[in-house]
């Protein structure tokens, strides 16, 4: 099936999102719980419903608990000025990290957060003392779920995979679709329905980056 737009790869697993990517735009609008460490003048009206304690001068008082979209929280966060502090969403806290370490495959990641890996990677932008544990948990969760995802993509050809895919985060869904497309392309080639097997986009992009590095 052809796509209605040229897909732009997400940059959320790196230091910054790629705002040409629809996935990253959606992820950056997910809410993050924060606490104001200083009064925020002239913003009380904007956060009035979320912050019932807004003062009459339209300032958000110090100590207010808000839920801000990720992009705004990143923009306001400053280690030196301490404008706000970030509270970890429950899915990234120690209790859930313990669940992931026991068996990451039992968790419905899409229900907990459709951009689990990308959003978690962006949390490392903030100076949480749990950053090292979060990054390790993200890595081990991905490793623990990767084999099952790819095995299913290769062994569920022409079968109903909606129940499996419904539990995957958006990045995992992309991997699953890539696996199924690779299998489909191989079977078409095996039946003589394709003239050649082409390299995947991941391999092609890696070669381009490597060639660019050599030129530099």
Curated annotation (Swiss-Prot):
Signal peptide: none annotated. It holds the Pfam family PSF3_N. The keyword Membrane does not apply. Transmembrane segments: none annotated. Keywords: Chromosome, DNA replication, Nucleus. InterPro entries: GINS_A, GINS_bundle-like_dom_sf, GINS_Psf3, GINS_Psf3_sf, PSF3_N. One of its GO terms (cellular component) is CMG complex. Residues 1-16 are annotated as: Not essential for folding and stability of GINS complex, but may regulate accessibility to the central complex pore. GO terms for biological process: cellular senescence; mitotic DNA replication initiation; multicellular organism growth. CDD domains: GINS_A_psf3, GINS_B_Psf3. Component of the GINS complex which is a heterotetramer of GINS1, GINS2, GINS3 and GINS4. Forms a stable subcomplex with GINS2. GINS complex interacts with DNA primase in vitro. Component of the CMG helicase complex, a hexameric ring of related MCM2-7 subunits stabilized by CDC45 and the tetrameric GINS complex. Belongs to the GINS3/PSF3 family. Required for correct functioning of the GINS complex, a complex that plays an essential role in the initiation of DNA replication, and progression of DNA replication forks. GINS complex is a core component of CDC45-MCM-GINS (CMG) helicase, the molecular machine that unwinds template DNA during replication, and around which the replisome is built. This is DNA replication complex GINS protein PSF3.
